């Protein structure tokens, strides 16, 4: 694809094309990071990007740049084709769709798939080899169900969803439109519910369901449990990384992002637009307000106010945590000073 052709497509997107350089129009065969790109590949830079220095030595053929004069001047001096965008990262994401178009499987049902006669598969839906679909389940139109997916009884999958290989949807699960469940993820598994008795642990039946609203994406190996009663609900547009555990009865707002190894205990309430970085733990029944952010390995045991940034274990406001971390590194020196003061102080 010619760079000029790509830019014509991108100018209709959401990245905000400002202007593009005239005269240079390389043929692009793909994309790569700036330090690895060749003359037939596209890359991008953001304002203040740490790779700015690498531009001088890069063999990249074309660039998507921010409106930053030093980058524009350097690209011009090196004879690199470029276009300037308000959001070059978003432009790069849109460009990847053009450079690497996805191949959609044919809308047919593989003969090895096992589909209950009372299940419904919508028009345009592709069902791969060894898929199992249980009684009363309903798949919407234009879905893609990859090999080995298991859909239990009474599951509802909205239009345009994609279920990757070996994903499992347990009974009663509900998926809205455009959801993606990646390989080996489990939606609607039994919640961790047991009642202590004199004879040991008595299992609490988990009769509830999991609801994924429109546009939710679930990463590989992630599990989302159903509760004993009621529902576990994931808000529209929420993106969940690999290996995340979401307990029974959790509710999240719209547009959240949870990184790998996040664990959310049963009954927690997560607001809209919340970001939980890697390995964050949220205790049962904790409440996290809208747009709050928890940095990696934070342990949230109480409530987090809307818009607050927290860090550490137990989680505290990020600025306070930074001060505490700075103090912690000075503890050996402080202990030495205290010993000297004690030694020099008359008894």
Curated annotation (Swiss-Prot):
Pathways per UniProt: Bacterial outer membrane biogenesis; LPS lipid A biosynthesis
InterPro entries named among the record's database cross-references: Hexapep, LpxD, Trimer_LpxA-like_sf, UDP_GlcNAc_AcTrfase_non-rep
Catalytic machinery residues: 248 (proton acceptor)
Alphabetical GO biological process terms: lipid A biosynthetic process
PANTHER family associated with the record: UDP-3-O-ACYLGLUCOSAMINE N-ACYLTRANSFERASE, UDP-3-O-ACYLGLUCOSAMINE N-ACYLTRANSFERASE 1, MITOCHONDRIAL-RELATED
Oligomeric form and interacting partners: Homotrimer.
Protein family (similarity comment): Belongs to the transferase hexapeptide repeat family. LpxD subfamily.
Protein name as catalogued: UDP-3-O-acylglucosamine N-acyltransferase
Gene that specifies this protein: lpxD
């Amino acid at each position: 694809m010619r760079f000029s052709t790509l830019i014509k497509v991108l100018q209709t997107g959401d990245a905000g094309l400002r202007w593009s350089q005239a005269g240079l129009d390389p043929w692009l065969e793909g994309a790569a990071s700036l330090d690895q790109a060749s003359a037939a590949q596209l890359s991008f830079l953001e304002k203040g990007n740490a790779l700015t220095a690498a531009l001088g030595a890069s063999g990249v053929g074309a660039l998507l740049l921010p409106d930053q004069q030093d980058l524009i001047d350097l690209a011009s001096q090196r004879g690199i084709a470029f276009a300037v965008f308000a959001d070059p990262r978003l432009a790069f994401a849109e460009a990847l769709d053009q450079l690497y178009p996805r191949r959609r499987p044919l809308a047919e049902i593989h003969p090895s798939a096992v589909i209950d006669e009372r299940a419904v598969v919508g028009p345009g839906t592709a069902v791969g080899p060894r898929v199992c679909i249980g009684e009363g389940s309903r798949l919407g139109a234009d879905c893609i169900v990859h090999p080995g997916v298991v859909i239990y009884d009474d599951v509802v999958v909205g239009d345009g969803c994609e279920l990757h290989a070996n994903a499992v949807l347990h009974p009663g699960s509900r998926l809205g439109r455009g959801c993606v469940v990646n390989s080996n993820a489990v939606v609607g598994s039994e919640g961790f519910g047991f009642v202590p008795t004199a004879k040991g642990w008595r299992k609490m039946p988990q009769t509830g369901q999991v609801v994924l609203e429109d546009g939710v994406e679930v990463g590989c190996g992630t599990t989302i449990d159903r509760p004993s009663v009621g529902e576990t609900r994931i808000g529209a547009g929420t993106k969940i990384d690999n290996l995340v555990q979401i307990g029974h009865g959790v509710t999240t707002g719209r547009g959240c992002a949870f990184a790998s190894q996040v664990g959310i205990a049963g009954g927690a309430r997560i607001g809209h637009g919340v970001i939980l970085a890697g390995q964050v733990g949220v205790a049962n029944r904790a409440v996290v307000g809208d747009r709050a952010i928890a940095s990696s390995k934070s342990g949230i045991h109480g409530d987090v106010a809307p818009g607050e940034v927290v860090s550490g274990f137990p989680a505290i406001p990020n600025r306070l945590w930074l001060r505490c971390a700075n103090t912690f590194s000075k503890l050996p020196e402080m202990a030495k000073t205290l010993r000297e003061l004690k030694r020099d102080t008359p008894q």
